[in-house]
Design a protein with these regions (language model features):
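Conserved helicase motor core of SF1/SF2 NTP-dependent helicases
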Residues: 104, 108-235, 239-318
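Hydrophobic side chains in well-ordered alpha-helices
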Residues: 26, 57-61, 246
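Interdomain "pre-motor" coupling segment immediately N-terminal to P-loop NTPase/helicase cores
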Residues: 39-99
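Short amphipathic alpha-helix segments
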Residues: 15-34
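Short glycine-/aliphatic-rich beta-strand segments at the starts of folded cytosolic domains
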Residues: 1-18
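A short linear hydrophobic-aromatic micro-motif
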Residues: 35-38, 293-294
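Flexible glycine-/small-residue-rich
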Residues: 8-10, 40-42, 49, 166, ...
């Protein structure tokens, strides 16, 4: 039995541990992807050679893994799975060409980076455009990264507030038929945004900002008649905004205003799907300076790798 060896003597013990993963989870993912055996012995990565092993791709994957460790000081089995999938599609060069710049820092000091090529393109688009549309299925990170971008803009004092909004339609439910005041009605629908805010700012800070209206949460209908200045405005679940609502929202933009519109066009709850303002906007607003339209793919799903396979199977029958 022969082995392919990669010298890691220039790497620290901690870096090699990160490469191996918690309880060797990264090595196990490499074993699964390459149908081989990866192990670490005497500061060397050893790979069992077999007839199907593509040694060049193994080298590329190991190099890409350490590239993430060098910049982000972390690596998990989901990263490894994604890197391997890119290698098999001959797209690793695209991944390495994208300088994965941190988007924001969490309350614990951890840096948030884009994890896929699509996410890196989205982050770059948010930095360089006034209006960004991000479409993609659940789990592609579009909403999370939009919030991270908004928080970073607020922390760096480039804007004065964050506005979070979304349509009030959800699987046939109407705010008018739900109990409680407006905040109680809207809050459950914005839970993913709250979770992201809490991770990046901490619960106490989020509550303080909401109280002072530094962070504003409101249904889309409440944007009518306003001019939004010095703010990052996130419209989530935008696939359920009508064409008229989308036009109304986009024309609220004032000075120093950035808008990020996120949605999943496979999850339209409107009676007529053709009434989706997100679908119309992505069609008619393409190729306008200052507006970027990003379509995230199933390969950008960053949840459990099984989620991507589930999404692909459902897509075949829908």
């Amino acid at each position: 039995m022969s082995f392919l060896e990669f010298d890691c003597s220039d790497r620290t013990f901690e870096e090699i541990q990160i490469f191996a993963g918690f309880q060797d989870s990264n090595l196990e993912m490499l074993n699964k992807c390459f149908k081989s055996v990866f192990m670490i012995r005497d500061q060397k990565i050893k790979v069992e050679v077999n007839d199907s092993l593509d040694t060049k791709k193994v080298e590329e994957v190991i190099d890409a893994c350490f590239s993430i460790i060098d910049t982000q000081h972390r690596l998990n089995y989901q990263d490894v799975n994604y890197i391997c999938s890119l290698a098999f599609k001959n797209r690793l060069k695209d991944f390495k060409a994208r300088q994965l710049q941190a988007v924001c820092k969490t309350k614990t000091g951890e840096m948030i980076y884009p994890k896929t090529i699509g996410q890196a393109i989205l982050c770059d688009a948010m930095r360089h455009n006034e209006v960004v549309f991000a479409t993609g299925v659940a789990g592609t990170g579009k909403t999370y990264l939009a919030v991270a971008y908004a928080v970073n803009m607020l922390k760096s004092e480039r804007v004065e507030k964050i506005i979070l909004t979304r349509p009030a339609v959800e699987a046939g439910e109407s705010l008018g038929f739900l109990p409680g005041d407006m905040k109680e009605k809207v809050d459950p629908y914005l839970r993913p945004l709250y979770d992201a805010l809490n991770e990046m700012l901490g619960l106490e800070t989020v509550e303080k900002y909401v109280e002072k209206q530094v962070i504003e949460i409101a249904p889309l209908a409440f944007m009518r008649g306003r001019t939004l200045n010095d703010a990052v405005v996130i419209l989530d679940e935008a696939q359920n905004a009508t064409c008229a609502q989308m036009k109304m929202f986009l024309t609220r933009m004032g000075k120093n205003c950035k808008m990020v519109v996120t949605g999943d066009v496979t999850q339209i709850d409107l009676i007529k799907k053709k009434d989706s303002g997100l679908m119309q906007a992505c069609t008619i607003l393409d190729h306008i300076d200052g507006i970027s339209i990003i379509h995230l793919e199933n390969s950008d799903v960053v949840r459990n790798p099984l989620v991507q396979k589930i999404i692909e199977r459902y897509a075949k029958v829908e």
